[in-house]
Amino acid sequence: MVDKKLYHLVNREDQSEYRGNSRTKVIQVSGVEIGGTRSVVIAGPCAVESREQTLEIARAVKQAGADMLRGGAYKPRTSPYEFQGLREKGLEILAEAKEKTGLPIVTEVMDPRLVGLVGQYADLLQIGSRNMQNFPLLVEVGRYNKPILLKRGLCATLEEWLCSAEYIAKEGNTEIILCERGVRTATSGEYDRYTLDLNVIRPTKVSTFLPIIVDPSHSTGTAAMVPDASRAAISCGAQGLLIEVIGEHTDRKTIKCDETQGIRPSILKKIITSVRV
């Protein structure tokens, strides 16, 4: 059972506006409404690997109908020898992509000391699953005047997830979007990367008024599974999707980060069409 005494700022029953109804807080991100009646799609590369790659994908996801552009400039990798991102140069590339496409930017911040820098470029600051309980980081973004995308930790309970949101809200920032991205289970790695926990969507919406979206890319780890996972997530009540995209003709072997899960822009367009029917 979720102990709602551990969080009250993001608890539905503690806020008179949302008590006793199923309304969701609508969060504005540079003109994009998240939490409304329209399914929001955030799409882009796992990592900003080059200017050419990022601009190509940005134009493609814009044409496919995406609302926002995702892309990692700072990458939390399991091994210190893996590609760590282009860092500030990556942020500059994202800024150029925004200028050329008009798409607001979503990118991850990993360090409390970098919140100000990343916030200069990003319209929506992402807290990744590995940092869901990085409490100094949660406090810092809570003090920053930008909406926050809070991913669920790899093994986090709903209570732990909402307590992390409470850390942010306690500092004054209640512009928080929750993102389910798959959890580690006994079968993780056997036929998928993680397990997409669609069961968490309804109890999350009962417990809090914060909008919830789903990442079908990291949760499945396989491009072929992303379309069905996307449609299932929306059917279960998710209010948006966070999807990784690669170039239409890009060789997966050349991709530096999560090469198996990115979908092609042509597939993205089909997903967007299907979830907005």
Tell me the role of every PLM-derived stretch:
Residues M1-V41:
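Non-catalytic terminal accessory/regulatory regions of metabolic enzymes
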Residues T24-C46, R77-P80, K205-V214:
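N-terminal small/glycine-rich loop or linker at the start of catalytic domains
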Residues V29, I34, Y144-G247:
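Catalytic alpha/beta core domains of metabolic enzymes, predominantly
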Residues S39-E56, P80-Q84, P104-E108, G128-S129, ...:
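Active-site mouth loops of central-metabolism enzymes
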Residues V40-P45, D67-G71, I105-T107, L125-I127, ...:
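Hydrophobic faces of well-ordered beta-strands that scaffold small-molecule active sites
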Residues R70-E88, G247-C257:
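Glycine-rich, proline-tolerant flexible connector loops at the mouths of alpha/beta enzymes
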Residues F83-T107, V141-P147, L198-I212, C236, ...:
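Alpha-helix-loop-beta-strand connector modules within alpha/beta enzyme cores
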Residues L86, G102-D111, D123-P136, P147-L158, ...:
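Catalytic beta/alpha-barrel core
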